[in-house]
UniProtKB/Swiss-Prot annotation:
<keyword id="KW-0694">RNA-binding</keyword>
<dbReference type="InterPro" id="IPR023672">
    <property type="entry name" value="Ribosomal_uL2_arc_euk"/>
</dbReference>
<feature type="compositionally biased region" description="Basic residues">
    <location>
        <begin position="223"/>
        <end position="238"/>
    </location>
</feature>
<keyword id="KW-0689">Ribosomal protein</keyword>
<dbReference type="InterPro" id="IPR014722">
    <property type="entry name" value="Rib_uL2_dom2"/>
</dbReference>
<dbReference type="GO" id="GO:0002181">
    <property type="term" value="P:cytoplasmic translation"/>
</dbReference>
<dbReference type="InterPro" id="IPR022669">
    <property type="entry name" value="Ribosomal_uL2_C"/>
</dbReference>
<dbReference type="InterPro" id="IPR002171">
    <property type="entry name" value="Ribosomal_uL2"/>
</dbReference>
<dbReference type="InterPro" id="IPR012340">
    <property type="entry name" value="NA-bd_OB-fold"/>
</dbReference>
<feature type="region of interest" description="Disordered">
    <location>
        <begin position="198"/>
        <end position="238"/>
    </location>
</feature>
<keyword id="KW-0699">rRNA-binding</keyword>
<dbReference type="Pfam" id="PF03947">
    <property type="entry name" value="Ribosomal_L2_C"/>
</dbReference>
<dbReference type="GO" id="GO:0022625">
    <property type="term" value="C:cytosolic large ribosomal subunit"/>
</dbReference>
<dbReference type="InterPro" id="IPR022666">
    <property type="entry name" value="Ribosomal_uL2_RNA-bd_dom"/>
</dbReference>
<comment type="similarity">
    <text>Belongs to the universal ribosomal protein uL2 family.</text>
</comment>
<comment type="subunit">
    <text>Part of the 50S ribosomal subunit. Forms a bridge to the 30S subunit in the 70S ribosome.</text>
</comment>
<protein>
    <recommendedName>
        <fullName>Large ribosomal subunit protein uL2</fullName>
    </recommendedName>
</protein>
Length: 238
């Protein structure tokens, strides 16, 4: 009897394929509050499974929350949040109050959603223009998106941008990297498996040895390879 494919095991939702969210510090979102407030950064924490560190902020009304850390902030630093907050590194301001060219991060699409854009380590967005009650922001991918003028954003660049420059050096470090995410690692090639484990497995060779294209309506145990592809291989030159 054949074995289940990796995607079939993932579809069942076993422990190896579920993100260990219980290890996270907590949701890194803006609080749903109105008006202007002052706050202080009381801690900077590593958030397992997330590229960027988070800061713990305590407001003047006693409310505490987490947001992605910005480059240059420090424990004890005071920040402002609200429509009339100053344009300073780490402050949370409505994007409609920011001039063009301002570098921002953790940008909301609609006020109250907690932050949708530019949340990964080292990412940022730039105010590129305004159109009516919408603000145009340019993401790191060069894509232009529209957000509400009442949406909030943090002034600055998300911290931790150089984490990709540190070499992993050994497979063990890569194991722990994926251990805190919803990723099964390592991923073995189908041609390297036994015939019982994969449709591409078996034989003393590293080739599929059969057409790798499969129908869109193929059963789950056979639906691997080039699924419903129009063509495979290199495109011939004219």
């Amino acid at each position: 009897m054949g074995k289940k494919l990796l995607q079939q095991r993932a579809g069942r939702g076993g422990i190896n394929f579920r993100s260990p969210s219980w290890r996270r510090v907590g949701p890194a979102r803006y609080p749903n509050i109105e008006g202007d407030h002052k706050g202080k950064i009381i801690d900077i924490l590593h958030n397992p499974g997330v590229t960027a560190p988070v800061v713990k902020v305590k407001l003047d009304n006693g409310l505490q929350f987490y947001i992605p850390a910005v480059q240059g902030v420090a424990v004890g630093q005071e920040i402002s949040i609200g429509k009339n907050a100053t344009i300073s590194n780490g402050n949370i301001v409505e994007v409609g109050q920011l001039p063009e060219g301002t570098v921002i991060c953790n940008v909301e699409k609609l006020k109250g959603d907690g932050g949708k854009f530019a949340r990964a380590a080292g990412s940022y967005a730039v105010i590129s223009g305004k159109a009516g009650n919408k603000v145009l922001i340019k993401l790191s991918s060069e894509k232009i998106v529209e957000v509400s003028q009442n949406a909030r954003a943090t002034v600055g660049i998300i911290a931790g941008g150089g984490f990709v420059e540190k070499p992993l050096l050994k497979a063990g470090n890569n194991y722990w990297k994926y251990r805190v995410r919803a990723v099964k690692w390592p991923v073995v090639r189908g041609v390297a498996m036994n015939a019982v484990s994969h449709p591409h497995g078996g034989g003393l060779h590293q080739s599929v040895s059969r057409p790798s294209t499969v129908s869109r309506n193929a059963p789950p145990g056979r639906k691997v390879g080039h699924i419903a592809s129009r063509r495979t291989g290199r495109r011939g030159g004219a």
